[in-house]
Design a protein with these regions (language model features):
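Helix-enriched interaction subdomains in cytosolic or periplasmic regions
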Residues: 1-2
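Short glycine/threonine-rich loop/turn motifs
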Residues: 28, 38, 52-195
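Glycine-rich phosphate/diphosphate-binding loop of Rossmann-like nucleotide-binding domains
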Residues: 5-62, 66
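Short catalytic/metal-binding and nucleic-acid-binding patches
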Residues: 199
Length: 199
């Protein structure tokens, strides 16, 4: 009977962990109050509707050390879901995906769009998202634009509900976001440009 009680408690703790979420906004502009954060309230509401207990994290700085520190802190506090929005673009100062990879070296980081190297302000070769897992905790690095977060949210929620592995969740998020980029007519969506580069 004691063992049953212990396994029930373990299950309850795991259930509680998986339902505790923290959402981190990222970026210098938010910290300075130059732009309003619409993503965090939106994600908080969507997750709470589905029974999550959501904490709003501090704004992450535009450096990978700060991202790593805040992710590490959230992991040690037992959050089952850690979401960052912003900081996944192609400019050099975007560090969310790198932070997730430091925590989980096998994180899934598919591209949502590819650029010609060295065009405009883009230093990297495209925009990636990241999904990593450490113990019972899942980390998801989403883009910053609010329309992209709105596009990703239903996929994220379904993936959590159906307990997809990190590769599946990352690929399906990337597919939805690549489609959105294609409709915006920006860049070349990664999923559809293999072997059929435009001449």
């Amino acid at each position: 009977a004691v063992l049953d009680r212990v396994s029930n408690m373990t299950r309850e703790i795991q259930e509680k962990v998986s339902r505790r979420a923290i959402v981190f906004p990222t970026g210098f502009e938010l910290k300075q109050g130059m732009i309003q954060d619409t993503n965090t309230p939106f994600l908080k509401h969507e997750l709470e509707e589905r029974g999550y207990y959501v904490t709003v994290g501090e704004v992450m700085e535009d450096n990978v050390e700060d991202v790593v520190e805040k992710l590490d802190d959230a992991l040690s506090q037992g959050f089952g879901l850690i979401v960052t929005t912003g900081g996944v673009g192609a400019e050099d100062k975007d560090h969310s995906v790198e932070g997730v990879c430091r925590m989980d070296p096998t994180a899934a980081t598919p591209y949502i769009v590819k650029f010609q190297q060295g065009t405009g302000r883009h230093v990297k070769d495209g925009v990636r998202i990241g999904v990593g897992v450490v113990g019972p905790s899942r980390m998801v690095a989403l883009p910053g634009p609010h329309d992209e977060v709105m596009c990703a949210a239903p996929v994220l929620l379904r993936g959590l509900e159906e307990n997809w592995d990190k590769e599946t969740l990352a690929d399906r998020l990337a597919a939805a976001l690549a489609d959105k980029w294609r409709r915006k007519g920006m860049g070349q969506p990664h999923h559809h440009n293999r072997g059929q580069e435009k001449g």
